[in-house]
Amino acid sequence: MDRAKPFVWRLVAASVCLLTFCHLARADSLEEQRNRYAQIKQAWDNRQMDVVEQMMPGLKDYPLYPYLEYRKITDDLMNQPAIAVTQFVRANPTLPPARTLQSRFVNELARREDWRGLLAFSPEKPGTTEAQCNYYYAKWSTGQTEAAWQGAKDLWLTGKSQPNACDKLFSVWRASGKQDPLAYLERIRLAMKAGNTGLVTVLAGQMPAEYQTIASAIITLANDPNNVLIFARTTGATDFTRQMAEVAFASVARQDAENARLMIPSLVQAQKLNEEQTQALRDIVAWRLMGNDVTDAQAKWRDDAIMRSQSTSLIERRVRMALGMGDRRGLNTWLARLPMEAKEKDEWRYWQADLLLERGRDAEAKEILHALMQKRGFYPMVAAQRLGEEYTLKIDKAPANVNSALTQGPEMARVRELMYWNLDNTARSEWANLVKSRSKSEQAQLARYAFNQHWWDLSVQATIAGKLWDHLEERFPLAYNDLFTRYTRGKDISQSYAMAIARQESAWNPKVKSPVGASGLMQIMPGTATHTVKMFSIPDYRGPGQLLEPETNINIGTSYLQYVYQQFGNNRIFASAAYNAGPGRVRTWLGNSAGRIDAVAFVESIPFSETRGYVKNVLAYDAYYRHFMGQKEALMSDSEWQRRY
């Protein structure tokens, strides 16, 4: 009986293999393919590679099969032959990881020191900086020196520290005697401007022995920009030393604008600055003298400097300062200083009309406001509200029937499956490739297709890629409508306002993370989430990972928005600014304006360009969402419009 057991087990194993083979042969349905895909991934994660090898061949028709191939290749990239990687890249030209793989394998071939093989694999410049450095080193290694030196120069001219792979390229370039001394100095300047003190020190330390005096001066300046006057007086006046002095001077001005202001004549004399270079220093200081704490002498000096400036952005900042102070005379003066091109911006056309109305020139003012109303966005809606007229949204309609050719093909099939598996960010990469390769009319159809599939973020992404600004339905889908209905019920904030905030924050990508750690649809910081959960007794919150779940994010996000909305008297202008820049800053801005200005002036005078644009967008987006909900779509409520700020 015991002797029969091995035979029995061999028979069972053969039967299992036969059943598996039969299953492989007939695994045609999408549901079966998805199940097998999940099984393969699970086996892979458990390092059951025999199971992976057995099951993969039966999944070649599944749209995400190339991702399995990619994993197989990259798991053992050090031992992959170039032909295998080349075949994969060529077979999947639109697959996002294939482009990543190309750069990775260039670096692998560099590790092998297979320079000819590297150039055969990648005849064109690869995508990443590290791979490019290896590519141009391969050019040098194979005798293509001119191309190598040009590539080295292009990679050299940055204030960032480059990958270690670039060191050997830069070393052979320097040793060849072909490195341009001006390029060397330019990188020091760029590093200084980027605040990369470590790189400045390294580069200065590598300068030839005969340049040790200037090298020492550069290092001293990088370590303490307050030495700028000593630097200016002890180094010869050259374009390089003037540029270095200007960068250091900007750092001084950030710390002590008055000290910088008084320093200008000495710098001008020491470095023999011309009027244009001198004005650049004045502009730097003028930017720092826009607060409420400047003296009368500083204010006069600032305005004299701006009056001579050619910087449009600086003059615009001065216009906004006049708006925030309720200084009508200053508003007129500084608007007049703007160049003609800048005066055509929506905001400055509106304020020109505002001044005309004040002078009784109603016909001219109304002509400007009516012209603005033909456009889209914040100021066109403001113009309508100022005139007491209804604003008409222009909405372009995408074709109801999407061309079937656009919805077929491997890219769209992969997008569908990635969205099924909730791999939103990978799907976005695939979608971006697909949309980018299409005509504008096809992009509109793709936006509509995504809209119909409830791929809200992909719908928005297609309208952005195609600049389909009047396709408002696809740009502003009623995403997660049920969740927003539920979590705004019983709150003072409207559903449309909460959705406008979410649309501005994430463009409806539920998996997006900001560089500073904000997560999900309403871009919530972990600390804010913890505080809000406690304040509102929100149950079942376990940690920041849940912020990528739409329901959790909307629950916490709408609660926090309700909190700031109530803090600021149910005013969306203040609440939106606070959501973006923090409640403390909004209180400071309110204290500065001191009830002297109207709502539009307050928005335009917000000193942070990001927050200013944020508030304008949210108010406009709220109006769009109210339109799609069949509600009144005036930009501001009566209380927001009529109060003083």
Curated annotation (Swiss-Prot):
Q: What is its main location?
A: periplasm
Q: Name one GO molecular function term.
A: hydrolase activity, hydrolyzing O-glycosyl compounds
Q: Which Pfam families match?
A: SLT, SLT_L
This protein's UniProt keywords: Cell wall biogenesis/degradation, Disulfide bond, Lyase, Periplasm, Signal
Record's catalysed reaction(s): Exolytic cleavage of the (1->4)-beta-glycosidic linkage between N-acetylmuramic acid (MurNAc) and N-acetylglucosamine (GlcNAc) residues in peptidoglycan, from either the reducing or the non-reducing ends of the peptidoglycan chains, with concomitant formation of a 1,6-anhydrobond in the MurNAc residue
Task: Please give the biological process terms from Gene Ontology that the record holds.
Answer: cell wall organization; peptidoglycan metabolic process
Protein name listed in UniProt: Soluble lytic murein transglycosylase
Q: Which GO terms describe its cellular component?
A: membrane; periplasmic space
Q: Where is the signal peptide?
A: 1-27
Of which family is this protein a member? Belongs to the transglycosylase Slt family.
User: What function is annotated for this protein?
Assistant: Murein-degrading enzyme. Catalyzes the cleavage of the glycosidic bonds between N-acetylmuramic acid and N-acetylglucosamine residues in peptidoglycan. May play a role in recycling of muropeptides during cell elongation and/or cell division.
Where's it found, cell-wise? Answer: Periplasm
* UniProt organism field: Salmonella typhimurium (strain LT2 / SGSC1412 / ATCC 700720)
* Cysteines joined through disulfide linkages: C133-C166
Instruction: Say which domain of life the source belongs to.
Output: Bacteria
Residue ranges, annotated region (Slt-type domain): 492-582
Cite the EC number.
4.2.2.n1
Active site residues according to the UniProt entry: E505
Q: Which PROSITE patterns match?
A: TRANSGLYCOSYLASE
